[in-house]
């Protein structure tokens, strides 16, 4: 009995002849786009519609050159809409004012430190804040950064990355497996991630309800924070670490004696070797065991080897080092916030699969080598760091909006949940590079 099938997005419409003939719409505007919009309004307000989450063709969009005619005719179209209809349409988009309560969901120390700058800004604005490890806990406003989340338990939800290399083995389409369409706001940390999102935004599952924004990476607001600098100086004094070139070892996973490889490759150089392992949860007891064993056989045996506790913020370690050595950890990206290069050892294995796989390092802002060449690569960076300026410049594209990240995030929360009026953050809203299209236009 239905006359209309609407496939994919609102740009893909298949109508039967009976429906078209019954419509009162005529091509009364010069703009084809406004004529189509007029027809679409009639369809939505008076007919039955079926939705399918599959588009037929995708085309790359090009910038529109002149919108004056369409803007004028759009205003004409809106002026002809019944006042009751217009009011009901506005009510659909208007969100109710929520309680000033924000719950931050985290499952590791790394996630906690990623979210903490936002929480501090929220507290300064009078929000009641809470951190929880229960990903299914109900919340008024929920801020998430995990692979698997439950935004349906929050009245308003935000999603951001917990890791700048997140899903790197699936780039550019992180969102096929980690879907954002259940959230209200999505946040990417910089230009390179914004480009990935734009390429995938034609898929419905990449689109939060209120949009995706290039707000930046919360931790990047803190790189010049006096608290981090003071904490770095305090740790350096506690370790009695001398003033000389310092190489930080910070892997994603500790396995297959990686720490041993690192120390043996560099122990005879006139440098500081600094180890900062991640604070793994108890469910990864085998990795915690590897970390403890490596420390037990190395600590105290080398005069230039220093350990920073796993529970310490990685920002402290990054403030102290001159370069980073890792496997595929996002620490290498975070080092770029401090203008420091990183080396990825590509033949170190990653045990998140069975059998373990080689490190996956698609990032173009990381210097890469095999473990047999690690010593020479470190010496090269120490003595000729200008060679790698192009790589460092690519890394700077990873971050946007430093110094204003948390402000813009909270402005968006205020705007959508508290009736806030500050909307300058809207300039950071992203648009798809492609759009769904059909073959019958």
Regions found by a protein language model. Name each.
Residues 1-73:
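Conserved nucleotide-sugar donor-binding catalytic segment
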Residues 3, 14, 71-97:
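C-terminal, non-catalytic tails of nucleotide-sugar-dependent glycosyltransferases
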Residues 101-227:
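Active-site and donor-binding regions of nucleotide-sugar-utilizing enzymes
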Residues 111-115, 215-295, 401-407:
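Conserved catalytic-core segment of nucleotide-activated headgroup transferases in glycan assembly
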Residues 155-161, 311-354:
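A donor-sugar binding/catalytic signature common to diverse glycosyltransferases
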Residues 180, 202, 206-209, 330-399:
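Catalytic binding pocket for nucleotide-activated donors in carbohydrate/polymer assembly enzymes
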Residues 288-310:
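Nucleotide-activated donor-binding/catalytic signature segment of Leloir-type glycosyltransferases, i.e.
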Residues 372, 376-441:
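C-terminal amphipathic helix plus adjacent low-complexity
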């Amino acid at each position: 009995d239905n006359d209309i099938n609407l496939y994919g997005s609102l740009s893909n419409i298949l109508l039967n002849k009976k429906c078209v003939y019954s419509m009162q719409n005529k091509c009364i505007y010069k703009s084809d786009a406004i004529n189509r919009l007029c027809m679409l309004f009639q369809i939505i307000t008076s007919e039955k519609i079926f939705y399918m989450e599959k588009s037929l063709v995708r085309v790359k969009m090009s910038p529109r050159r002149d919108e004056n005619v369409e803007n004028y005719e759009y205003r004409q179209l809106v002026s002809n809409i019944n006042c009751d209809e217009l009011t009901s349409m506005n009510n659909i988009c208007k969100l109710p004012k929520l309680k000033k309560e924000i719950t931050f969901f985290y499952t590791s120390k790394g996630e906690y430190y990623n979210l903490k700058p936002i929480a501090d800004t929220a507290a300064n604005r009078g929000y009641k804040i809470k951190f929880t490890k229960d990903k299914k806990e109900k919340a008024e406003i929920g801020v998430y950064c995990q692979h698997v989340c439950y935004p349906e338990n929050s009245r308003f939800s935000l999603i951001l990355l917990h890791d700048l290399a997140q899903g790197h083995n699936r780039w550019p389409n992180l969102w096929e497996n980690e879907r954002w369409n259940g959230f209200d706001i999505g946040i990417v940390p910089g230009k390179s991630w914004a480009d990935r999102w734009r390429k995938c935004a034609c898929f419905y599952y990449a689109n939060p309800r209120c949009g995706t924004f290039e707000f930046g990476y919360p931790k990047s607001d803190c790189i010049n924070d006096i608290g981090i600098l003071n904490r770095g100086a305090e740790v350096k004094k506690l370790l009695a670490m001398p003033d000389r070139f310092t190489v930080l070892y910070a892997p994603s996973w500790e396995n297959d004696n990686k720490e041993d490889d690192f120390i043996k490759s560099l122990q005879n150089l006139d440098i500081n070797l600094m180890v900062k392992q991640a604070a793994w949860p108890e469910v990864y007891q085998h990795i915690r065991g590897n970390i403890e064993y490596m420390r037990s056989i190395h600590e105290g045996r080398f005069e230039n080897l220093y350990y920073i506790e796993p529970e310490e913020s990685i920002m402290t370690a990054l403030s102290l080092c001159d370069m980073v050595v890792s496997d595929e950890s996002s620490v290498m990206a975070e080092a770029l916030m401090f203008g420091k290069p990183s080396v990825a050892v590509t033949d170190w294995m990653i045990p998140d699969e069975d059998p373990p796989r080689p490190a996956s390092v698609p990032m173009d802002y990381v210097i890469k080598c095999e473990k047999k060449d690690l010593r020479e690569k470190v010496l090269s960076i120490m003595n000729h760091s200008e060679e790698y300026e192009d790589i460092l410049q690519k890394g700077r594209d990873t971050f946007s909006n430093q110094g204003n990240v948390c402000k813009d995030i909270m402005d968006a929360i205020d705007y959508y949940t508290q009736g806030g009026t500050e909307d300058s953050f809207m300039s950071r809203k992203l648009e798809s590079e492609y759009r769904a299209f059909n073959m019958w236009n």
